[in-house]
A protein has these predicted regions:
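Conserved ABC transporter NBD signature motif
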Residues: 61-72, 76-77
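Catalytic Walker B motif of ABC-type/P-loop ATPase nucleotide-binding domains
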Residues: 159-162
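ABC transporter nucleotide-binding domain
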Residues: 177-270
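Conserved catalytic motifs of ABC-family nucleotide-binding domains
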Residues: 155
Length: 314
C-alpha cells in the first residue's frame, strides 16, 4: 500500500471580490520532503497557506493534509499541522521560555512533559542560552525563531513556514534555513513559501512557482531550469545610451532576448563564449563602452523570467 501524500492540493480557488487571489492551484507534497512555493509578493502564496491552514475557506476545490480534508475535517488537519505565520505571534513582555510554555499549555502539555518539550524546542531554534530574556529584547530574527518554536511544540507531522526570513539579519536567516533542514532530517514535511530564489534552490526537494494566483510550474530545481534550456544571462553595464546597441544585439546569432533592468542591460544567450565578443564589437561601433560584465548560468530567476517575461523581484 502506497504512502498517502502529506499535502494534496486539489484545484483550490479563492477570490476577494473581483480579485482572483488563487486560481485552480493543484500540487502534491510527499511525506518528509521540503516543498517551496516561490513567487513575488502578491502571487497568492499566503492565501494558499491560509486555506491549507483552515484559516480561509476556499471558494472552490479542496486539499488534504495527511488525509484530512480542509473542508470537512478541520480538527484533523490542525492535529497534524504546525504553522509559522509571517506575523510575529508572541507576548513581548514574556521570556522565550514563558512564551513556549504558554503555547505548550494551549496544546495540552503539562508538567515534566511541557518542560522537556520546551527545552527540546529551545535547542532546535538555538535559543537555550537566551531563554530567560524577554522577547522584547530580541532581534527580529530571534523573534522569528521563537515563532518557529511555537509551531513545533506539539510535534506536528507537517509544518507550514510563510516567508520566515523576511526582514532579518543574515545570521538569523542562516539559523532558520538550517533549522528547516533539521526538521526534514527528523522526518517532518515542510511547506515553505518565499520570494528568495536562492532559498528555494538550497532547501527544496520540489518547487512550485506561483504568479498572479496560479501555479505556473512545478518540479525539482533541475527540472524547472530545463524549461529555459541552456540559456545563460549576461548582465552588462554601459557607459552611454543603451537603446541603440540593444537593437543591434537583438540581431546577433545566439541572442534570444535583450532587456534593460535596474540600470543594467541583460542579454539571454545560448553560448556566452561565442556571443560575448559580438556584443563588444557592436557596442564599439556605436562608441559605447561596456564597463562591467556578469555572466549568470541558468537558475530559477531565469525560469521565472522565461515564464512571465519579468524578473522575480519585480
Amino acid at each position: 500500500m502506497s504512502e498517502i501524500p502529506a499535502i494534496e492540493v486539489l484545484d483550490l480557488q479563492k477570490s476577494f471580490g473581483e480579485n482572483k487571489a488563487v486560481q485552480g492551484v493543484r500540487f502534491e507534497v510527499k511525506q518528509g520532503e521540503i516543498f517551496s512555493l516561490l513567487g513575488p509578493n502578491g502571487a497568492g502564496k499566503t492565501t494558499t497557506i491560509s486555506m491549507l491552514s483552515c484559516l480561509l475557506r476556499p471558494n472552490d476545490g479542496d486539499a488534504r493534509v495527511m488525509g484530512h480534508s480542509i473542508r470537512s475535517d478541520q480538527m484533523g488537519v490542525k492535529s497534524v499541522l504546525g504553522v509559522v505565520p509571517q506575523e510575529i505571534a508572541l507576548y513581548e513582555d514574556l521570556t522565550a521560555r514563558e512564551n513556549l510554555s504558554f503555547w505548550g499549555k494551549m496544546y495540552g502539555l503539562r508538567g515534566s512533559k511541557l518542560k522537556l518539550r520546551v527545552d527540546e524546542v529551545l535547542d532546535i531554534i538555538g535559543l537555550r542560552d537566551r531563554a530567560k530574556e524577554r522577547v522584547s529584547k530580541y532581534s527580529g530574527g530571534m523573534k522569528r525563531r521563537v515563532n518557529i518554536g511555537v509551531a513545533l511544540l506539539h510535534k506536528p507531522k507537517v509544518i507550514y513556514m510563510d516567508e520566515p526570513t523576511v526582514g532579518i539579519d543574515p545570521q538569523s536567516r542562516r539559523n532558520i534555513l538550517d533549522s528547516v533542514v533539521a526538521l526534514k532530517n527528523e522526518g517532518m514535511t515542510v511547506l515553505y513559501t518565499t520570494h528568495y530564489m536562492e532559498e528555494a534552490e538550497e532547501l527544496s526537494d520540489h518547487i512550485g512557482i506561483m504568479d498572479h494566483g496560479k501555479l505556473i510550474a512545478c518540479g525539482t530545481g533541475e527540472e524547472l531550469v530545463k524549461l529555459v534550456g541552456q540559456q545563460t544571462r549576461i548582465d552588462l553595464t554601459l557607459n552611454g545610451d543603451g537603446a541603440n546597441v540593444m537593437s543591434l544585439w537583438r540581431d546577433i546569432d545566439g541572442v534570444s532576448r535583450v532587456f534593460a533592468e535596474d540600470g543594467l542591460v541583460s542579454v539571454l544567450v545560448t553560448d556566452s563564449n561565442l556571443v560575448l565578443p559580438h556584443l563588444f564589437e557592436a557596442a564599439a561601433k556605436l562608441l559605447i563602452r561596456i564597463t562591467s560584465v556578469d555572466i549568470r548560468e541558468p537558475n530559477l530567476e531565469a525560469v521565472f523570467l522565461h515564464l512571465t517575461g519579468r524578473a522575480l523581484r519585480d
